[in-house]
Amino acid sequence: METTFRSALVKNFLGQSPDWYKLAILVFLVVNPLVFFLVDPFIAGWLLVVEFIFTLAMALKCYPLLPGGLLAIESVLIGMTSPDRVGEEIAHNLEVLLLLIFMVAGIYFMKQLLLFVFTKLLLNIRSKMLLSLAFCFAAALLSAFLDALTVVAVVISVATGFYSIYHNVASNRSDGNDGNIDVGDDSTLVSDDHKQTLEQFRAFLRSLLMHAGVGTALGGVMTMVGEPQNLIIAKSAGWGFVDFFLRMAPVTLPVFACGLLVCLLLERFGVFGYGAKLPERVREVLTEFDRQATAGRSKQEQVRLVVQALIGIWLVVALAFHLAEVGLIGLSVIILATSLCGVTDEHAIGKAFQEALPFTALLTVFFTVVAVIIEQHLFTPIIHFVLQAQPSSQLALFYLFNGLLSSVSDNVFVGTVYINEARAAFENGVISLKQFEMLAVAINTGTNLPSVATPNGQAAFLFLLTSALAPLVRLSYGRMVWMALPYTVVLTLVGLLCVQFTLAPATELLTQWHWLTLPSIEAATH
């Protein structure tokens, strides 16, 4: 039967996605202008936010860039926002985009070192509880000084390496060369036993990825360089590095301890998708791979590992002291790693950018949705409600509403909007300087902690969800939400209790010890 133009067009639209999914996106595209022009732009704006979250939730059906991009283009065409506003949002977040483009590519060129270090870690720590704790703690420690996206990129690179090694062996490709095999194709596996082992290995990797992902949130909230919005809040409040850490400590340290405890309990009782152990067959494969790699490592390869280790030290120092924009530091890593490790072919260099560029494009689309949120004042009623509450209730309300909005929007945007509103209230004499500082802590912790609830709440989680690794280990949107649920509940509740009951007395105590001083009004208002 001859294919008609219409049927060919329908088949081409969103490719292999299910027909019901294609229909849903078409309905969204038809309904949005009708609601915007005939009902209410405010409702249309929230409808767009819900639809965009839907595309993220269905990431395994179709990469969200396509349907999300169509919705974003339409929102600009019908006037929900303007190209200029989108351009402003991209300009405000240029540092994040540069980070994705260059830092993730830079990590790619340190893959040999990362695989070497983490293979030793994986093989030497046989207890899954201790291994999970090590991943969570290491991710938290790194995220306190590096960006969470960088840390997640490292973990993804390592997990992909482990997965590829076993999949190649299970597919009778013991040479470890994954360049010509689709590691997502289980039909190449030689036996059902290998398939069952691979399923257990996937569950093992999923749990480590989630522990590390939550670890980035636990560490990222502690310091002013941990997350982009932290820096904005610190500047607004006039805090330095040590000041910021001490101000947050009454909330972040108890939350950190409880987060590590949750990590141990989840592995101990094997609930919410955790508890899977490293299969012995996989351990044997990785041990043999490590033995062969060690025995066959030439002097040139040893020098590469040393060079990559030195570049890693440069990376940590440069990021910790903010010697340049994060993305530019990533570019320096690319230049140093390729130059000193002998990677000179354009195609070999180009592979490093394959992982991050689709997500960079998706994040740019996300900034269009954020522009709609700003243009249509979608969060304004919530912000006004919180600011009109009694001072005794403001801390808890700021914390909770920040967490709620950060779960569906951009953390940087939510944190910026709230800190600007709080500062304006202080400048207008509505709240005192002391209350403003307490609110700044509530805003920062509220933006960072409850937002682990959904992948779109944390850029690092979204990056993990849309990475090439996620479908390999069967990590979907729903599964991420389910696995993050115990962390979400504990971190949110402990954070709320600390904000409400321990923040004020602990801050007062630190002030009495002269560890903290109120910044000058000029510092807080500039």
Curated annotation (Swiss-Prot):
GO terms for cellular component: plasma membrane. The keyword Cytoplasm does not apply. Coiled coil: none annotated. Its main location: membrane. PANTHER family: NA(+)_H(+) ANTIPORTER NHAB, TRANSPORTER ARSB-RELATED. Belongs to the NhaB Na(+)/H(+) (TC 2.A.34) antiporter family. Na(+)/H(+) antiporter that extrudes sodium in exchange for external protons. This is Na(+)/H(+) antiporter NhaB. The lineage of its organism: Bacteria, Pseudomonadati, Pseudomonadota, Gammaproteobacteria, Enterobacterales.
